[in-house]
Amino acid sequence: MDALKPFLPEAKGVLPYYMIILSIISIGNSLQAYTTLHFSRRVYNGRFIRNPKLPSKTNNFEPEDQTNKLIPAQNDPKATDQLTPLAGRLFGTWTLITCIVRCYAAYNLHIGPVYTLAYWTYIVAFSHFASELFVFKTMTFGLPQYFPFALASTSLIWMPLVRDHYVQYN
């Protein structure tokens, strides 16, 4: 453990270590998003079919450009998920950017704006997962979805409670 000490955040308390651990996990998540869709498809497991109510393509209308071109159909045998290689890479990139912000914040929790930026990463993550579950229906709730919700929720509750302990400069 002494060999790791120079690399660990100096701030007192558990929050910086929590953020470092989540960042390390996020690096792995980002890498897997670039190499396989398997794990992301377990999270984004909603099933969809083409929207039969959309009109056919015309000179003025392109069904492929519509955000509602697919509709939820969890029990339809023809239904597929929406995860594509592009979506996987975008999610991997977003996760890596979030990881960088949280990792930087773990070492700089004493700076108010940095603390706030880290907090916003959890707000965005929670909002994303909640909207995918409740609005866009790209996931159903189960064990793979539990962890993103639990980690983001924990941070959203915990960080405001301990802000004054860490932040020295607003």
Curated annotation (Swiss-Prot):
The chain crosses the membrane at residues 7-27, 116-136, 141-161. GO terms for molecular function: protein-macromolecule adaptor activity. It comes from the Eukaryota. InterPro entries: Erg28. Pathway: Steroid metabolism; ergosterol biosynthesis. One of its GO terms (biological process) is sterol biosynthetic process. Keywords: Endoplasmic reticulum, Lipid biosynthesis, Lipid metabolism, Membrane, Steroid biosynthesis, Steroid metabolism, Sterol biosynthesis, Sterol metabolism, Transmembrane, Transmembrane helix. It is a multi-pass membrane protein. It is found in: Endoplasmic reticulum membrane. GO terms for cellular component: endoplasmic reticulum membrane. Heterotetramer of ERG25, ERG26, ERG27 and ERG28. ERG28 acts as a scaffold to tether ERG27 and other 4,4-demethylation-related enzymes, forming a demethylation enzyme complex, in the endoplasmic reticulum. In Fusarium, the biosynthesis pathway of the sterol precursors leading to the prevalent sterol ergosterol differs from yeast. The ringsystem of lanosterol in S.cerevisiae is firstly demethylised in three enzymatic steps leading to the intermediate zymosterol and secondly a methyl group is added to zymosterol by the sterol 24-C-methyltransferase to form fecosterol. In Fusarium, lanosterol is firstly transmethylated by the sterol 24-C-methyltransferase leading to the intermediate eburicol and secondly demethylated in three steps to form fecosterol. Sterol 24-C-methyltransferase; part of the third module of ergosterol biosynthesis pathway that includes the late steps of the pathway. The third module or late pathway involves the ergosterol synthesis itself through consecutive reactions that mainly occur in the endoplasmic reticulum (ER) membrane. Belongs to the ERG28 family. This is Ergosterol biosynthetic protein 28. It comes from Gibberella zeae (strain ATCC MYA-4620 / CBS 123657 / FGSC 9075 / NRRL 31084 / PH-1) (Wheat head blight fungus). The gene is ERG28.
